[in-house]
Amino acid sequence: HGHAWERECSVELIHPDGSEGFSVNGGLRIRGGWSRHPEFPKHAFRLFFRSDYGDAKLHYPLFGEEGVEVFDKIDLRCAQNYSWANGDGRNTYLRDVFSRDTQRDMNQPYTRSRYYHLYLNGLYWGVFQTQERSEARFAESYFGGQVENYDVLKVNTENYNYTLEATDGNSDHWFEIYNMWFESNQEYFSLEGRDQFGNPMKGGQVHVDIDNLIDYMLVIFYTGNFDSPTASFMNNKRPNNFYAIDDRTDYSRGFQFYAHDAEHTMFAEAFDPAYGLQEDRVNLHMRTDGSHMDVADFSAFHPQWLHFKLTYNDEYRMRFRDRAHKHLSGGGSLTLAKLEERLNEREEQIDKAIIAESARWGDAKRASPYTRDD
């Protein structure tokens, strides 16, 4: 964890069609929480571009016209929990990116990804995805402002403590929101810098992008994500796998939330601690099996707890209903046709590539390899 674990490397991108790639020097770290364990041999990685190694940044359109062209870091992610390298036959390589692509199609901020074959020291290492890192530099690239003015919140999983941390800036503004309550309209509207009647106030501060929060929660609910932003593995008492970003000097936007590491989603069958098609993330506070959602203190404060507090307000519930109707009907981003289109687009991108993944990792944990047909 940190710079001490970074190793100098050379990185080359080669396109099969012969189009221009790049060759640069950089730093490499193993990325992730549980996936860093030696029991998972594939690992995910993070690339850093620093003047220590050569160019201070990577200048290349990694995501074409979809994204920016300058990066100081980029993730190389891979499936872990349900992957062949981990001995699990439920590998799809689609779950995580599906949630992030859905945020995109809801016209919300999101992190971009592309599939690649990775060779490590000349040895084929399998299928990976580039992924943007939703941190201050990322926010500055897409929203402007100054990197030092951004607060970025995530969950620190070191030593399995699963506590909120500011990976950039500080958590002061998030703590202010933690101490708010929203049952009255005056309290609710203050979250958007409005008066008790819902009218914008001069100099009023937007604390949270409400539509973004609702759309984020719709993705969590629709995909049955039982590991974000609170985790079934910890009886829904601790936070996990979310990013929240706010420019503390810009009063017009407020915190926005990003789907992250959404592997624990879209299962048909039930298995501990998941309920498959019966996974209900909407009513976590009502569970009676000891896994009801709770937040004991600020260290565990996450977007779903904020959403839960907001549901005490009639105006918020009406707004949630309107956003749900927008996305679940009339060709919206959560209608069946759009969902299938989104999933099929990614499936086509790796339909053949997964054969190489099978050859590399299909027999990592068993004698008979998993294959594309699995």
PLM region descriptions:
Residues H1-A4, S10, G33-R36, F40, ...:
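Middle-to-C-terminal accessory/interaction subdomains
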Residues H1-L164:
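Conserved ATP-binding subdomain of kinase catalytic cores across diverse folds
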